[in-house]
Amino acid sequence: MSGLEIEFTGFLTDSLSLDMNLGFLDSEVTSDYEALDNVDIYQYFFGEEDLRYGLRENVKGNQLAKTPEFTADITIKYETNLPSGNSLTTVAQYVKRGKFQQRVNNNPVVDSIRAYTIGNLTTSIGFSDSLAVDFMVLNVTDEAGVNSSMTDVFGVAATGLELIPPRQIMTRLRYSF
């Protein structure tokens, strides 16, 4: 496995900043290793061990589990003081998670997880050091994506998907003490 992670924070002006985190990853099984894919073997039971054993596969060359080749989180933030004396902070965030394989078996039926891209927007008004209100739109484009999946965790030959949250529009009141 090899990769590169880049973290960058830049102040573009007195009130505008850019925060960028990028990850590049190349993951691959480089040695011979035989594994059983429980998705393929679930129908064989006691007395059929030889059939199960015959279904083993060499995973050399397969992508490691849960290792997207590319991830990005780019955030631009604008901060200023309003004429009223209140503070204003606006944040726009871009998040990209590349495709990956859920398990080292790389079974195309259950292991391929698609890439997704989402955007988040937040505006905050600070009335004092202890009181603020936030207006948020998360997953602005209402992207339907899969964060993760789990295959055959309980031996029932099923795959469960963990979805990313849909678009959310929220208001939050913050009080610090």
Predicted stretch roles:
Residues 11-13, 83, 114, 126, ...:
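Surface-exposed coil/turn segments at beta-strand junctions on protein surfaces, enriched
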Residues 6, 20, 76, 92, ...:
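Hydrophobic, well-ordered secondary-structure elements that form the walls
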